[in-house]
């Protein structure tokens, strides 16, 4: 792995991350965000999402894919909802 990998900077809910870019085909690069284990980012995102969703009358939270489970769990705690 290169010591100077190309990255894309993002800020989510005030938390800054530099996402490594991966070339998926010649000339096409994508940034990968993996929230598994990133508790600082998950908690901040859940806090801001809970505020944004405050006026919705949700009864339960559902997520479709394993990597989003930490965010769904943190959001359920912040909103007091089952998931």
PLM region spans:
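Glycine-rich, small/polar surface segments that engage phosphate groups of diverse ligands
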Residues: 60-83
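Active-site-facing substrate-recognition patch
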Residues: 1-57
């Amino acid at each position: 792995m290169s010591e100077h990998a190309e990255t894309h900077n993002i800020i989510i809910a005030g938390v800054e991350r530099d996402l490594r870019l991966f070339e998926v085909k010649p000339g096409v690069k994508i940034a990968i965000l993996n929230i598994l284990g990133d508790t600082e980012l998950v908690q901040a995102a859940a806090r801001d999402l809970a505020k944004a969703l405050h006026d919705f009358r949700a009864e339960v939270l559902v997520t479709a894919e394993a990597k989003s489970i930490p965010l769904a769990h943190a959001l359920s705690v912040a909103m007091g909802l089952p998931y």
